[in-house]
Amino acid sequence: MKKRKIVVALGGNAIQTGDASAEAQKRALEETAMYLADMIDSGAELIITHGNGPQVGNLMIQQKEADSPKTPAMPLETCVSMTQGMIGYWLQNALDRALHAKGKGGHAATVITRVAVRSDDEAFRNPTKPIGPFYSEEEAKELMNSRNGGLVFKEDAGRGWRRVVPSPAPVSILEHDVINDLVEHGHIVIAAGGGGVPVIENGDAVSGIDAVIDKDFAACKLAELVQADELVILTGVDYVAVDYLKPTERALKRVTTEELKGYIKEKQFAEGSMLPKVKAAIQFAEAKKGNKTVITSLKLAKDALQGNAGTIVVQA
């Protein structure tokens, strides 16, 4: 029986649960890997993506604190690639152990993934994504006026000033053929971590750019390009809900893309959390006839693959 190719987008709770130490994050990923191994055991070929918000934020603080002519701070796009390697390494080890415990073969492999964006994307005119450490107003203005120039800072809810960067839409994933080859040879692939490293293509040349790609949209684009059967977006809740946290709250179990578009117009989903997941779910479900997206929690992921849990999104 042909295995289903599934792109799984891990939420932040799958990696970091409050303690930012390496050991705590490794422990969180050990638990996450057991759930992923259950999915593999049920007959799925997995390509795993993940977020990196807390990790890249902490790394940028470290870069700032150690910045000097001898140890210069690395740019954001380089920090994204560094966190892809770090989280990928931890998850590879955890998955290999989880599969071994189940008597399963196969190995996990991490692909440092570049994601092409358009240089004329509207997001570059209006950077909105806050990243990295907080600064005083004086420090922020000094950095904006420095010879490094081009940096944009905004006040963040009275907590200080933070750098803001564009969040452009992913256009293509440069390594998608490599990822497919690894899957076809029986490997579990970890790719497009943190939304991927954003790059601009100019003929044969590729150059990184300081931006942050939404991880759910990157997962959606990856699922399209590798022709996945399903996109599974794992988050902190079991179902997508309308009237969330109200007495009239209702879980959505099977829903069409058109129904979800109606709920978006009603502003049912929060901007910074569920809305991008729902939009990515719609995009993948509508990309090709027969595509399906599932949004659920990590603990229900295996049941969701059987159609017994989570919010299942299908084309209208």
UniProtKB/Swiss-Prot annotation:
Gene3D superfamilies for this protein: Acetylglutamate kinase-like
Gene: arcC
Pathway participation: Metabolic intermediate metabolism; carbamoyl phosphate degradation; CO(2) and NH(3) from carbamoyl phosphate: step 1/1
GO annotation (BP), single: arginine deiminase pathway
Enzyme class: transferase
Catalytic activity: hydrogencarbonate + NH4(+) + ATP = carbamoyl phosphate + ADP + H2O + H(+)
CDD domains (UniProt xref): AAK_CK
Top-level taxon: Bacteria
Keyword Cytoplasm annotated: yes
Entry protein name: Carbamate kinase
GO molecular function term, any single one: ATP binding
Similarity comment text for this entry: Belongs to the carbamate kinase family.
Organism: Bacillus licheniformis (strain ATCC 14580 / DSM 13 / JCM 2505 / CCUG 7422 / NBRC 12200 / NCIMB 9375 / NCTC 10341 / NRRL NRS-1264 / Gibson 46)
Keywords: Arginine metabolism, ATP-binding, Cytoplasm, Kinase, Nucleotide-binding, Transferase
Subcellular location: Cytoplasm
Enzyme nomenclature, EC number: 2.7.2.2
GO CC term, one of those recorded: cytosol
